[in-house]
Amino acid sequence: MAGTDREKALDAALAQIERQFGKGAVMRMGDRSKEPIEVIPTGSTALDVALGVGGLPRGRVIEVYGPESSGKTTLTLHAVANAQKAGGQVAFVDAEHALDPEYAQKLGVDIDNLILSQPDNGEQALEIVDMLVRSGALDLIVIDSVAALVPRAEIEGEMGDSHVGLQARLMSQALRKITSALNQSKTTAIFINQLREKIGVMFGSPETTTGGRALKFYASVRLDIRRIETLKDGTDAVGNRTRVKVVKNKVAPPFKQAEFDILYGQGISREGGLIDMGVEHGFVRKAGAWYTYEGDQLGQGKENARNFLKDNPDLANEIEKKIKEKLGVGVRPEEPTATESGPDAATAESAPAVPAPATAKVTKAKAAAAKS
């Protein structure tokens, strides 16, 4: 009897909360629709896999940090381009006043439709972020960078004045305000951050990020990006080998790593990453200097194979799909499943689940290799 009374009291309380705050304000977790996590691809298949869900989760706070010239803005611009290609609206809050439109365009960003703000101070920047997020019209907003969100008091004060904790308080207040709105509007916020060193640290890493601790707590994903090697063509440097570590992940297991190439003037080499992962998971075979896919040659040397995949995007998409299907990430909901029933089931089952190998396109690689 007591249990029944408690259940009735709970049901009455739930009903009252719904009347007062609206439907969905409170519910049993089992009543929620089990929808897959929506993501924005990063431009690197290896990083999409390391994130565990196929990309950057929608409606969350993401922090990307690392040393100077490690590829933070490049990685973020690829996410911007992918969000735009999916039909999304993107805003870029350039607090550093350093965004290069030509470089962004080379990475695939539609600069004509990119919403750009170059605020005068940190309060203005975060107020703009808050207003844009609450509009519910954005898919992605980028803040570059946290270190450049200088409080108004610091700008208006004298050089050398002490402003301890101002920026940390500003970030804490802003994140408290926007986190709920991000989730409701399914807007992803990427905060690019810089590294600083703590003085007098004897044990452990002296490195820390700017803006206090609030961003560390509110971020669902934190990415540590580092340049590990310089890529050379002869004696000329043509790019960097980059490693990204997922140091925090609330949507999948953390601490996974991804490596990929960033080419100067071109950004992340998606095709190079596909070749590396294809070899690792057995879809692409390497024999000596030759790379082959399903018995057909892609090219001699990684650079030739990369160029061939770049010229044949359908084949690159096919390899990427097989890799993600094997690893169980990034499966698109619009793909037909074998369990469909009804009048269209026969049609769905007869349609191939994976595109047929592009043998005709692959033969071009043999011809190109023969000429060389």
UniProtKB/Swiss-Prot annotation:
PANTHER family: MITOCHONDRIAL DNA REPAIR PROTEIN RECA HOMOLOG-RELATED, RECA. This is Protein RecA. Residues 345-359 have a biased composition (Low complexity). GO terms for biological process: DNA recombination; DNA repair; SOS response. NCBIfam families: tigrfam_recA. Its main location: cytoplasm. GO terms for molecular function: ATP binding; ATP hydrolysis activity; ATP-dependent DNA damage sensor activity; damaged DNA binding; single-stranded DNA binding. It is found in: Cytoplasm. Belongs to the RecA family. ATP binds at residues 66-73. SMART domains: AAA. Can catalyze the hydrolysis of ATP in the presence of single-stranded DNA, the ATP-dependent uptake of single-stranded DNA by duplex DNA, and the ATP-dependent hybridization of homologous single-stranded DNAs. It interacts with LexA causing its activation and leading to its autocatalytic cleavage. The keyword Ribonucleoprotein does not apply. One of its GO terms (cellular component) is cytosol. It comes from the Bacteria. Pfam families: RecA, RecA_C. The keyword ATP-binding applies.
